[in-house]
């Protein structure tokens, strides 16, 4: 690639940014850097650069940062790229998940599988395969070091280009059931790549300056943004090291086909590009899918009758369907053999946060002010990104990432029954925030009955003859219509009490989402006499299945957990 002299390059970029800001309509560019001029964005501390070349290589380039969160336990290994840049990451399949959390997630998943695509609540992740365990983001600390040579650098600015910390296997082990794969064609194959989905001259300019700094320092670590089909790359990983799609599909297949996961369903979404059809690569995508997943277990578009409701997940699994594949692009007849078009599935929506708390549960910043209570059973998949490029956010704009799916927002999202919340940087702690049925650290008793008591929205194990409890009854035609029985009964009589209600369409049941659980709790607190202490839930069978069985090991079978002092390998 032809390289322009640094001074000419910086002037050219400054002129581009000045023109960009001058032509913008509406509010001026936000400037948290308090620059005197937009040109100052690209001013470098050149004297410092000249002094720091040797020191940079010692303190930054050759450093091996530990990128495993402090509260995560796993097998730590040293992951290096082909240039010798390394970081400490978690080995595939070794992230520990507490037993209570594994069981709580499995319980909620069993309940969710009773609902269909349009109403089930199952955790997802954003850009699932752009993860640190597979090398995405390993070079970030080098580019973060380059930031120090910008005149406006402030302590705390980061370069963070991986969406996830852990492998696909670990995400699945943590309860994720919606996987997003960013698929692009370059270097003669389909790869997992975070390619330019938006146009940001600010990001393009920063990448160019990063590469000029690399030349001045003599590090040889430049941002690969020139790959055909992937320009710019939004990750610091070299294009030739971005993972082949086949490897990701193989990993998903290995997990799904393990005997202990025979009762699980997986949703896979390809965030792909229309060029795959133009380049005649859709057939290759389908061939890769069929190589790792038997066609008989794939739910395919022609197998559904669209004028009827979507089947429940448990119904699909009973007939051997275990996985569904969706695409962000309509490939017409080329893709319809296997791929559902995302936008045609349950009026799919990806609204931005914030989300108003229960009972409103509306995405107030969405254009249509949509929300869970609309009862049109739309799939809501909010996704948020925590990628950072110094002073640029995940959208390549000046500013920070706001309204994130994290430990603070996810409990409210769970209470509203949002279908597929898909955050960045999923961890066991972040998954804890999605639990609505069981209190932290608590395990239910598989030999007892289950009730929702006044003192908490989480469930309790109680004696099956506990007095002063009403049955929770749901409309068989509408899982969001809940009422309570007329009078207290023992648990064994709850089904008859619901069937005796005047409507004739009510049955004794159990909430399948945080939203349904909140509806039942609201009935208890607002409509039941004060003498009623709680509500029977038809959950004994599910609780018995989950809490009477052994859960998976905290890490992958056969993998012990050790500190980096004990295990230091290169993957």
Per-region residue spans from a language model:
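Acidic, Ser/Thr-rich intrinsically disordered and amphipathic helical segments
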Residues: 55, 247, 251, 284, ...
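Charged/polar low-complexity intrinsically disordered regions
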Residues: 293-302, 323
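Extracellular, disulfide-bonded carbohydrate-recognition/adhesion ectodomains
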Residues: 319, 329-571
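SF2 helicase/translocase NTPase motor core
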Residues: 305
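Cleavable N-terminal signal peptides of Sec/SRP-targeted secreted and luminal proteins
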Residues: 6-26
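Eukaryotic intrinsically disordered and solvent-exposed regulatory patches
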Residues: 3, 105-107, 309-312, 456-460, ...
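Sec-exported extracytoplasmic/periplasmic mature domains
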Residues: 173, 257-258, 290, 294, ...
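Long, acidic (Asp/Glu-rich), low-complexity accessory segments flanking structured domains
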Residues: 26-178, 185-269, 273-276, 280-284, ...
């Amino acid at each position: 690639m032809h390289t322009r002299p640094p001074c000419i390059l910086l002037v050219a970029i400054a002129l581009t940014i000045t023109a960009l800001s001058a032509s913008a309509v509406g509010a001026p560019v936000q400037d948290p850097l308090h620059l005197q001029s937009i040109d100052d964005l690209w001013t470098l501390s050149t004297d410092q650069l000249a002094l720091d070349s040797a020191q940079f290589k010692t303190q930054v380039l050759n450093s091996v940062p530990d990128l495993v969160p402090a509260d995560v336990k796993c097998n730590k290994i040293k992951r290096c790229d082909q240039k010798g840049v390394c970081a400490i990451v978690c080995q595939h399949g070794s992230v520990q998940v507490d037993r209570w959390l594994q069981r709580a997630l499995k319980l909620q998943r069993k309940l969710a599988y009773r609902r269909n695509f349009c109403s089930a609540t199952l955790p997802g992740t954003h850009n699932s395969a752009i993860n640190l365990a597979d090398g995405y983001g390993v070079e970030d600390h080098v580019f973060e070091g380059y930031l120090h040579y910008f005149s406006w650098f402030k302590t705390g600015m980061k370069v963070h280009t991986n969406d996830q910390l852990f492998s696909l296997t670990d995400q699945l082990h943590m309860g994720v059931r919606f996987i997003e794969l960013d698929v692009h064609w370059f270097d003669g194959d389909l790869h997992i790549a975070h390619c330019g989905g938006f146009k940001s001259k600010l990001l393009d300019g920063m990448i160019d300056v990063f590469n000029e700094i690399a030349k001045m320092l003599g590090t040889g670590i430049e941002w690969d943004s020139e790959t055909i089909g992937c320009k710019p790359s939004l990750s610091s990983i070299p294009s030739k090291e971005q993972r082949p799609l086949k490897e990701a599909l193989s990993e998903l297949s290995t997990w799904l086909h393990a005997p202990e996961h025979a009762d699980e369903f997986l949703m896979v979404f390809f965030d792909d590009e229309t060029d795959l059809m133009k380049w005649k690569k859709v057939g290759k995508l389908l061939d890769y899918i069929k190589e790792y997943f038997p066609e008989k277990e794939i739910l395919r578009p022609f197998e559904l009758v669209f004028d009827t409701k979507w089947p429940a997940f448990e119904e699909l699994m009973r007939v051997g369907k275990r996985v569904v594949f969706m695409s962000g692009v309509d490939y017409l007849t080329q893709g319809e053999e296997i791929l559902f078009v995302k936008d045609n599935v349950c009026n799919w929506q990806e609204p931005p946060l914030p989300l108003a708390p229960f009972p409103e549960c509306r995405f107030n910043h969405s254009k249509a002010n949509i929300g869970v209570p609309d009862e049109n059973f739309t799939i809501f998949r909010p996704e948020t990104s925590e990628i950072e490029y110094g002073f640029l956010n995940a959208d390549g704009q000046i500013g920070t990432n706001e309204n994130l799916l994290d430990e603070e927002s996810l409990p409210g999202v769970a209470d509203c029954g949002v279908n597929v919340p898909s955050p960045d940087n999923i961890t066991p702690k972040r998954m804890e925030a999605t639990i609505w049925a069981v209190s932290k650290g608590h395990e239910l008793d598989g030999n007892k009955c289950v009730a929702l008591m006044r003192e908490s929205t989480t469930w309790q194990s109680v004696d099956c003859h506990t007095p002063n409890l009403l049955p929770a009854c749901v409309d068989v035609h509408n899982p969001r219509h809940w009422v309570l029985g007329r009078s207290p009964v023992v648990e064994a009589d709850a089904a008859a009490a619901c069937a005796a209600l005047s409507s004739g369409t009510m049955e004794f049941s159990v909430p399948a989402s945080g939203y349904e659980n909140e509806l039942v709790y609201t009935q208890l607190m607002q409509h039941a006499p004060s003498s009623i202490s709680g509500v029977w839930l038809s959950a004994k069978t599910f609780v018995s299945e989950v809490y009477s069985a052994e859960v998976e090991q905290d890490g992958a079978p056969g993998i012990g957990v050790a500190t980096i002092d004990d295990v230091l390998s290169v993957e």
